[in-house]
C-alpha cells in the first residue's frame, strides 16, 4: 500500500498515454476521491483510504465490473465491521468472497506470472497487481492490453488509466505479485424453461399462419 503522501514528481516523467484498444472497460476510481479519501482505513489510527487504500480501491473497481454495487467507502466499512482486515488495515483477500456472497471469489495470491495474467485478461477477468510506487507497496488493476504493447492498468493512486510500462516499467520486473478473482458463472437455463420457451414460440408461429 502507498503509505503517506508521495510527491507526484517521484514517478511522473514523460506524459503517459491513455490505455487503449484491448483493455476491459472499467471506470477508474481514485483512492484520493474526496468522497472517501479521509476515512480511516480499517481500524488504523493513522492510515486513511486516501493514503493507503490502493488495494481496496483496486478491488472495488474489479467488483463493480463484475456487477457488485460498491465503492471504496462501502467496501472499507464492511471490511472494518466484519473482520476483513488483519493488523488494523491489511486487506484479507479472502474476505472478498464473503463480501460478495460468493458472486466473486478470491482465487489466488501468486507471483508475477505473465502468462497467467494474460490468460486471465483474455478471459476478461481483471487482475490486481502489486507494484512499488515511490518505494512503497502499491496495488493497481490490470485491465488488458495496450495497442502500443504491454498491459494497461487502472491506477488507484493517480485515478487514471495508463500503460503499465509508462509508469512502472517492464511488467516482468515491475509486477511483484498478483491477486486473481473468479466471478460466479451465471446459472444455465433449465431444460424445462428452454422447452417451454420453444413450445410458446412454435404456438405463436402457428397462430400467425
Per-segment meaning from a language model:
Residues 1-84, 133, 147, 189-191, ...:
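Active-site-adjacent structural segments surrounding the nucleophilic cysteine of cysteine proteases
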Residues 69-115:
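Catalytic cysteine-centered active-site loop
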Residues 44, 108-152:
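Active-site-adjacent substructure of cysteine-protease-like catalytic cores
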Residues 132-209:
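Active-site signature of cysteine proteases
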Residues 12-16, 89-96, 114-117, 163-168:
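Intrinsically disordered, low-complexity boundary segments flanking structured domains
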Residues 53, 57-61, 74, 91-95, ...:
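Extracytoplasmic/secreted proteins, especially bacterial periplasmic and envelope-associated proteins
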Amino acid at each position: 500500500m502507498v503509505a503517506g503522501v508521495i510527491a507526484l514528481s517521484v514517478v511522473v516523467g514523460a506524459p503517459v498515454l491513455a490505455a487503449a484498444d484491448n483493455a476491459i472497460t472499467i471506470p477508474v476510481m481514485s483512492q484520493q476521491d474526496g468522497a472517501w479519501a479521509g476515512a480511516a482505513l480499517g481500524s488504523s489510527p493513522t492510515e486513511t483510504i486516501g493514503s493507503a487504500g490502493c488495494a481496496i480501491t483496486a478491488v472495488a473497481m474489479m467488483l463493480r465490473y463484475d456487477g457488485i454495487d460498491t465503492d471504496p467507502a462501502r467496501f472499507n466499512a464492511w471490511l472494518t465491521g466484519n473482520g476483513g482486515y488483519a493488523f488494523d488495515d491489511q486487506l484479507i483477500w479472502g474476505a472478498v468472497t464473503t463480501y460478495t456472497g460468493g458472486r466473486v471469489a478470491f482465487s489466488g495470491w501468486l507471483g508475477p506470472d505473465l502468462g497467467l495474467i494474460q490468460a486471465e485478461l483474455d478471459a476478461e477477468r481483471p487482475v490486481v497487481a502489486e507494484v512499488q510506487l515511490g518505494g512503497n507497496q502499491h496495488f493497481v488493476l490490470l485491465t488488458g492490453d495496450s495497442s502500443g504493447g504491454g498491459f494497461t492498468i487502472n491506477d488507484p493512486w493517480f485515478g487514471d488509466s495508463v500503460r503499465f510500462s509508462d509508469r512502472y516499467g517492464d511488467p516482468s520486473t515491475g509486477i511483484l505479485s498478483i491477486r486473481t478473482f473468479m466471478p460466479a458463472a451465471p446459472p444455465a437455463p433449465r431444460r424445462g424453461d428452454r422447452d417451454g420457451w420453444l413450445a410458446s414460440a412454435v404456438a405463436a408461429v402457428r397462430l400467425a399462419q
